[in-house]
Amino acid sequence: MLGAHAADQMENFELRDRYLHEIEHLPQKQQLSRHLLLAESALSRRDYPTAAQNLEAAAKINSNLSRLVRLQLRYAFDHGDAADVLAKAEKLVKAGAINDYEAEQYQNWAYRRLLSEVTDAGSLKACLKRIPESLKSGELCVAIAEKCERLGLYAEAVKWVKAHYPQTRQPELLEAFVESVRFLSEREQQKAIDLADSWLQEQPDNAPLLMYLGQLAYGRKLWGKAQGYLEASIALQPSVSAHLVLARVFDETDQPQKAQEQRNLVLESVAEEEHPAALTQPN
């Protein structure tokens, strides 16, 4: 096997296969290393049928071997099998064969994958039960809010943001919040504006929050409030979104000149991004 390993490392597959052919005549229980080497080589070539065949044969000999489980993890990851990735990563953690950082990376990927496969309220509920609280309130917090909104679970999306935004203050949560609020009743929309306004009291210089409040007020046709929020947002941090919504506010209040001014500012900012000013050359 040492010769086969060395030949494989040198990518001398003819020599490797000659060594492996000799080992092939040994009893099945003595062929574990052969199956592992063939599986690893097949995975590197993305020859998944051969990899699966050898992984299965190796598992019949010793299913708990850490090297085998690592290869199974790699196979599951390549196939996008989130449930199997979680199972194999957990097995390696228990065996002390994988460090915390690597395990966390695999777990984060797997939970994101599971979340992406959710198609309705029932499967979302089942998925959320599997995800650790630390991830739900951390790295996956925004993705969960966005998933609720995309599934049309607007009340759930608003409830999620209400529960998590005060702690995380992730501006990305606000987009899912605003997009979902507009599908709720007028009473619920007003409650959402009041809620977001209460967040603003704690962080009055939060430009994204001001912009999204402006969008909420625009949706409720509260033109004066919308203008105030948007102008405050632009004063702190100009953005294309804030300028465009403010232009629509001016359209609704019969101020076409001011509306055009906002759109001109957008065009100027886009032009600057596409054609930044040339650096001044020294004389």
Place the predicted regions along the sequence by residue.
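Alpha-solenoid helical repeat scaffolds
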Residues: 21, 56, 87-90, 125-129, ...
